[in-house]
Amino acid sequence: MSPKRIISTPLAPQPIGPYSQAVQVGNTVYLSGQIGMNVRTNEMVTGPIRDEAQQAFTNMKAVVEASGAKMSDVVKVNIFIRNFNDFPAINDVMKEFFQSPFPARSTVGVAELPKNARVEIESIVVIE
């Protein structure tokens, strides 16, 4: 088994619990969930869900790039949302960060998320 490497960047919010921003094993990187927290203020982005989702994807991108990968290397995205009425807006934001062919994806409705977030995004990256 390949040794694991911990990925950490100051360009994304620091973990709010006992976990790493990402862990790399071999050429696969497993990203922890990112929420719409502004890294400079450590406050949640307020306003439309679109703004919160953009911040969550921006945070995810920072961790992806800290691993040495690109967003086009993302193979799987898991999105957790509190309200499925937000689904179309989150889809629109995702298209700002990914182009076809899109990564595989699951979207799961949940009752609550950390910091009262409305969306949380985790992903798996394979570095070629």
UniProtKB/Swiss-Prot annotation:
SUPFAM superfamilies: YjgF-like. GO terms for biological process: 2-oxobutyrate biosynthetic process. Changing N59A: Loss of imine deaminase activity. Keywords: Allergen, Cytoplasm, Hydrolase. GO terms for molecular function: 2-iminobutanoate deaminase activity; 2-iminopropanoate deaminase activity; deaminase activity. One of its GO terms (cellular component) is cytoplasm. It catalyses: 2-iminobutanoate + H2O = 2-oxobutanoate + NH4(+); 2-iminopropanoate + H2O = pyruvate + NH4(+). PANTHER family: 2-IMINOBUTANOATE/2-IMINOPROPANOATE DEAMINASE RIDA, 2-IMINOBUTANOATE_2-IMINOPROPANOATE DEAMINASE. Belongs to the RutC family. Catalyzes the hydrolytic deamination of enamine/imine intermediates that form during the course of normal metabolism. May facilitate the release of ammonia from these potentially toxic reactive metabolites, reducing their impact on cellular components. It may act on enamine/imine intermediates formed by several types of pyridoxal-5'-phosphate-dependent dehydratases including L-threonine dehydratase. Preferentially digests Leu and Met in cooperation with L-amino acid oxidase, but digests Phe poorly. This is 2-iminobutanoate/2-iminopropanoate deaminase. It comes from Dermatophagoides farinae (American house dust mite).
